[in-house]
Amino acid sequence: MIIDYKKEGKLGIFTINRPEALNAINVQAARELHDALVDFRDDPELWAGIFTGAGEKAFCAGADIKDMLPFLKEILPASPWKMPATNMRGLKIWKPLIAAINGLALGGGLELALACDIRIASEKARFGLPEVTLGLIPGWGGTQRLPRLIPACKAAELLFTGKLIDAQEAYRIGLVNTVVPPEAVLSTAKEWAQQICQAGPLAVRAAKQAMIRGLSMTLEDGLKLENDLEGYAMSTEDFAEGTKAFTEKRKPDFKAK
């Protein structure tokens, strides 16, 4: 197995385990990632997910060109996105996702991180979308997510040149949430995930859905979506428990119901 998928309490941990190839994604890895994400999405006991890479050099160096190229050439002309659906494209996951970026995040690796909600970076991490240097463009959401996350001029700089930036520059432009020592990347991601899991899980998913879907809506439509999702949250058992716990001055015991 290339995707090492483990469950730790309320967390789903996804580790790309190809350190000898800088954790590049091949066809097998893409299929395994799809299967793991579907299981994560559908498991009611899992409330948050973390992505990371095996070893110290790379989070994910993108697509394994030698392995993926024949596959892509076969499917792209007829159906550009017959790739296995993941959080990057084709699979909607409203549970929060955190990228623990322990090294290189290049091409599809950066796109995987962009498809997460929170990004924790190692001091040694480097980021880039070098696809244009191969005569290609990012195809796993990079052209769409990057300019939604950072200023358009900085997105253009990365997209048009394929240049790499370090962790501090990524933090400066708002690409990552925080930068930590290499040995603290995964533990920090778990701390953030555990903090998220203290909140009502259905409310967190509703907030994520409102945020993501609202980006493609007018303000008026986004406000209506927010109102609808707030109504949903207020109908849950978790909301009743949360308000009761508040009045009783205790921690709520949320059940994702």
Regions found by a protein language model. Give the residues of each.
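Short, active-site-adjacent cap segments at secondary-structure transitions
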Residues: 56-60, 106-107
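C-terminal alpha-helix plus adjacent terminal tail
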Residues: 1-8, 42, 56, 162-168, ...
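Crotonase-fold acyl-CoA enzyme core
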Residues: 89-204, 235-236, 240-241, 248-250
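Terminal peptide-recognition signature
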Residues: 14, 18, 32-33, 51, ...
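Hydrophobic alpha-helical membrane-association signature
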Residues: 29-32, 185, 226
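Conserved CoA-thioester-binding segment of acyl-CoA-metabolizing enzymes
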Residues: 1-56, 71
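An acidic, glycine-rich surface segment that forms the CoA-thioester-binding/catalytic face
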Residues: 30-42, 65-102, 134, 149
